[in-house]
Amino acid sequence: MPTTPDLIVLHEHPEWQKPLFAALQRRGVAFEPFDVTRAAFSNTAPPRARLYFNQASPSAYLRGNTRAVPLALAYMRTLQQQGARVLNGADVFALELSKSVQATLLQTLGIDTPRSITFNEAAALRAHAHEITWPAVLKPDQGGSGARIEVVESIEQVEAIFRRDPSYWLPDNLFLLQEYLPHDPEQGIVRLEFLGGQLLYAMRVKTHGRFNLCPSPVCNPDDGDGICEIPAAVEAPPVEFFAYPEVPAAAVATAQRIVQAARLDVGGIEYLETPDGRRVFYDINANSNLRPSVAAEFGFDPFERVVDYLVAQLRA
């Protein structure tokens, strides 16, 4: 690795990063990976690189890397206090780590998003019984890879889930009970990938009832089952991804507002459309696992585009 890299990439899942690292090497970019799963940093050491790019994931704990998230957050805050440029930095990562804060941001922007109740004790939901419609979606505040997301029918069922397995609260001891919104399963949900504030591509994702919608071919390959730490909660066909060139301009404009408000450098925004015509935005992803097969239908390699962006930032 170069002793004085221009770029340092924070990460915790080497398989996800292989295409990006290969593209950086092809282009001759002086970069260095920084694996936050087993790391240390000095608060007195100055930044080594001109640019840092955060690719750490909230789902790190699912791979036994629980300590990666606080290390990444602390390191980025230190770097930024020292004046370093960090793409998808500490504030963006903190937003990605909290579905509750994401929901509040969307509401503040006047964007339709599922009603949510955040809680750290299942019994406390009873005080909000008048706000809940059933079924509802139970999901962790620190999400990732669709883990621990369930459709539930009652407060009693929620209480039973945590009583049966207290470790369900981990890693952050916060959950959301969120409005359940049906959508056309043939249309799926929509994910918009952004790079530098501009739409890179849009895709439709047919979930088949699954919640792990990770676009990385490592997790959801085009030709079969992936290597993923999240077992499928239901017996269902694999998740399918389709290029969506006809994505409505209004949806793109709304997503751009989210990207700008979140100060997201690279990432994905997800929404669904309900049978009664609501377009509901519900997820902000800073760690964007790009889908080469979808981007190929638009005529480009998405990782080459990311390298174009990183090189432009180095020259800025």
PLM feature spans:
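Extreme N-terminal starter segment of soluble prokaryotic enzymes
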Residues: 2-8
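Conserved N-proximal alpha/beta basic substrate-recognition cap immediately N-terminal to
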Residues: 12-115
